[in-house]
A protein has these predicted regions:
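Catalytic Zn2+-binding segment of zinc metalloproteases
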Residues: 85-102
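Metalloprotease/metallohydrolase-associated module, dominated by Zn2+-dependent proteases
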Residues: 24-58, 97-173
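Acidic/histidine-rich, surface-exposed loop or edge segments in extracytoplasmic proteins
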Residues: 62-68, 114-116
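Alpha-helical architecture
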Residues: 81-85, 127
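Short pre-active-site segment immediately N-terminal to the catalytic Zn-binding motif
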Residues: 65-82
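Bacterial N-terminal signal peptides
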Residues: 9-18
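Solvent-exposed loop/turn segments at secondary-structure junctions
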Residues: 53, 75-77, 95
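Bacterial N-terminal signal peptides that target proteins for export
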Residues: 1-10
């Protein structure tokens, strides 16, 4: 490479790249802390240092029967927290059932998500996992509105085949 080009690359392009990527990392940490605080405000304990996190492919889990979600320090921690937090809502607030209809989920999830779910989970787990995956990708406002509606009301809505009456994710925020 031409020495002048290399000098330009090292003095301009590289520092700009570092500046552009550094705030993203900080924003990701802030986002995780923001989501953690949202859960903790709802009396959900979020644990990041747990013995199970030594398991090679474990990103997180919901501790059944508790108000505790474990998020390991790998992967997309925000997505993991939202996914496992939705499992908490399914177990504690929906009593083990799902909120969104299976046919609706199949229509809304990408082909890649559907393929991954088909490969990773047994048919009896598919709907719960698909719903948690879908909900983890919603805006925080939408996610926590649904979470609160399920987990703070006396009359928890029961799931139906068509859940658009309760949750319409196509409505603008």
């Amino acid at each position: 490479m031409n020495p002048q080009r290399l000098a330009v690359l090292l003095t301009t392009v590289l520092p700009i790249t570092v500046l552009l990527t550094a705030p993203k990392a900080a924003a990701a940490r802030e986002s995780f802390e923001t989501v953690r605080q949202q859960f903790e405000a709802r009396s959900v304990t979020v644990v990041s240092d747990h013995p199970r996190c030594s398991e090679r492919n474990l990103f997180g889990l919901y501790v059944r029967g508790s108000r505790q979600v474990i998020v390991c320090r790998r992967g997309n921690q925000v997505n993991t927290l939202l996914h496992e937090g939705w499992h908490l809502a399914q177990a504690r607030c929906l009593k083990g059932t799902s909120y969104l209809g299976e046919e609706w989920l199949k229509a809304e999830l990408s082909w890649r998500d559907r393929r991954d779910l088909d490969v990773l989970y047994k048919s009896g787990q598919w709907r719960r996992e698909a719903e948690a995956r879908y909900m983890a990708n919603q805006s925080l406002e939408r996610y926590f509105a649904a979470f609160d509606a399920l987990c703070t009301s006396d009359a928890t809505p029961r799931p139906t085949n068509s859940s658009s009456e309760r949750f319409n994710p196509t409505v603008n925020d």
